[in-house]
Amino acid sequence: MKEIPKSTKVVVIGGGIAGCSTAYHLAKFGWKDTILLERDQLTSGTTWHAAGLVSQLGPSAAITKIRKYTTDLYKELEKKIDFSAGLKLNGALSIATTKGRWQELQRQATTAQLFDVHVEVLNIDQIKKIYPVINEKNILGGIFMPGDGQADPIGVTNLLAKAAKELGVRIFEKSPVEKILVKNGRVSGVKVNNQIIECEYLVLATGMWSRQIGEELGVSTVSYTHLRAHETDSYLVCRLLLEK
């Protein structure tokens, strides 16, 4: 087993996709003195439950920019690291059945083009050519994103972990954090496997366990908002991942 260092600049707790992505990007921007601690194995928390949808189009320009960057990053790292993230970019189709939603999709398509995201605005005949079995009732139009698709959440996480390691990040599995140390109102380190690791900064990337850890520190974490998809009187959206 690798020896855990006694000090580091940043400790990231959590070996899911959020933790591994954080560690990678910290190192990418120069913060290479970073340690990631995972209590079990990478992706053994909630990450492996994810659907793995890869979508470039967002509800705003900022989200679209981030999603485009993410998709490009996965493709770039797959080539650089020579490790598969399970990317399967067969395209995605979004349709609208109301005028309001149709205008919204057209607006999003315009935003996507500003960030060089390939998007096709389709009428019902064009939609049927892509997805012949679709029920065309009430469909006003749609947009097709050829660069969208799916990825393997475990594969993406391990891809980011490998990329982070190449940049100098040290990752320790089977290393549950027993205690977070606080000095003068600031986090000063963590206790792992009966060993103290001093640090300047701490990142909580522990998903559903973050609230519990935050409460132990007297810190309020961001609450979760659960969304439920359902048909309404205003619009109905159908998003399809297409097989080739």
Report residues per predicted region.
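Beta1/beta-strand and adjacent pyrophosphate-binding region of the FAD-binding site
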Residues: 5-16
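Dinucleotide-binding Rossmann-like beta1-alpha1 core, especially the glycine-rich loop
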Residues: 51-130
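Central helical "cap/lid" subdomain
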Residues: 196-228
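Helical element adjacent to the flavin cofactor pocket in flavoenzyme catalytic cores
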Residues: 147-196, 200
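N-terminal Rossmann-fold NAD(P) dinucleotide-binding loop
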Residues: 19
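Glycine-rich FAD pyrophosphate-binding loop
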Residues: 29-46
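Aromatic pocket-lining residues of Rossmann-like dinucleotide-binding sites
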Residues: 26
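Conserved small/polar residues in nucleotide/adenosyl-binding loops
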Residues: 225-233, 244
